Amino acid sequence: MKNRVNSLWTLFQERRLSRRTFMKSCVALTAILGLPPTMLDTVVKAAETTELPTVIWLHGHECTGCSESFIRSSSPFTSDVILNMISLEYDDTLSAASGEPLEEHLKKIMAEKNGKYILAVEGGVPLDENGIYCTVGGRTFKESLVEAAKGAAAIIEYGSCASWGGIQAAKPNPTNTVSVSSVVSGKPIIKVPGCPPIPEVMTGVVMHYALFGQIPPLDSQGRPKQFYGNRIHDTCYRRAFFDSGLFVE
């Protein structure tokens, strides 16, 4: 007998939710991911057969604004993402546990899910004074990041701090803060810049990987094309005034 896949569909079955409710969720996910309606069957199949991803979320040099944005997602709701669509095993902001028990759990998950988990990172990486300007669990953030990145299947850089260095990297940059990709290499990296990013973009990126097991198509800067491919300016109803050179004085 085949092992049962811990997919989104099996989760719906365990909670005795109808097939109709499952299909509604798949339709919503298709729209959120910016996919055409013709991709619905692909999304449904992925939701039936793909195992829910394990996510480890690290916090570096940041203000937690990206997490504040993430927990305000409404399409889908953050509670649905965390409880139903992914397995968030570590986040020192959202986790119920703290201190040594949480850090021990992180080590356990990294060992059990080696090569299979998604590493979400929020915040830049300070390098001066051996990284002492940001420590978590008695270790520098750089140490924690490098170790966690080794076993990650993919890395998501949430926010401008993780993507580019952020405010901390502004001149004169006293802590020598850099982006995550300046420290980590050799892994698929998805940049989700913004201060903070749009919450639905944050959930959409992790859900794309959850459904298809691969990172979405990226632009030249490493950002997901479905979310960063067009400028709001291009579809603004005031664009005609801009093109005509009509400005308020």
Question: Predicted segments — roles?
Answer:
Residues 1-17:
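N-terminal secretory signal peptides
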Residues 21-43:
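N-terminal export signals
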Residues 47, 52-54, 61, 65, ...:
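Metallocofactor- and cofactor-centric catalytic cores in central/energy metabolism, strongly enriched
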Residues 56, 156-159, 190-192:
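Hydrophobic/aromatic beta-strand patches that form the interior of the parallel beta-sheet core
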Residues 71-88:
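Short catalytic helix/loop segments, enriched in acidic residues and glycine
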Residues 139-152:
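Catalytic-core regions built around general acid/base machinery
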Residues 165-186, 190-194:
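Class I SAM-dependent methyltransferase SAM-binding "motif I" and its flanking Rossmann-like core
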Residues 202, 207-249:
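A conserved mid-domain beta-alpha-beta active-site/ligand-binding segment of alpha/beta enzyme cores
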